[in-house]
């Protein structure tokens, strides 16, 4: 492997992008449990030792991928919610929110792995930086949502998104089990466990928002 140290800012950014791209590709192909830092380094054509110049661990790499995915999600939500400004159209709002969320399986899978995997092998500094970014994105999505559904109110919308993120994050892995489990829950005897992710997320979001509006 021929490796040259990146010195200029654009070279450093390119090296980071190569590492992130390699990690994202491996994640989509194998899932996070099967991806090692060695595999990421090999895919990015960089030595494992030099990966540490850019990221402190495998988990730090995936935290950055998740941060970027959430930013894309929020930016797109701002765009698609803008036409609903002042409408108080709960059905249209939930449809837009859920459909945009469902379209981002990488983000959903990484969110599901956040507490049990991604936050386990990183420094406090990395966690703080990640959480600060997420707080900024939360403010943006709350603002866009309040513009679309002003009757819910700022506090009500905060409660809704707290519910939404936590419910979505827990629901995704429950509705995307391992293949052998999926075969079993598809049997009539176990239909109770066979839930559709989008429909369940949509239905529960409608219930919560209507409840907030009824207060």
Model-derived features: where do they sit?
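N-terminal hydrophobic signal/anchor transmembrane helix of membrane proteins
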Residues: 73, 88-109, 194-215
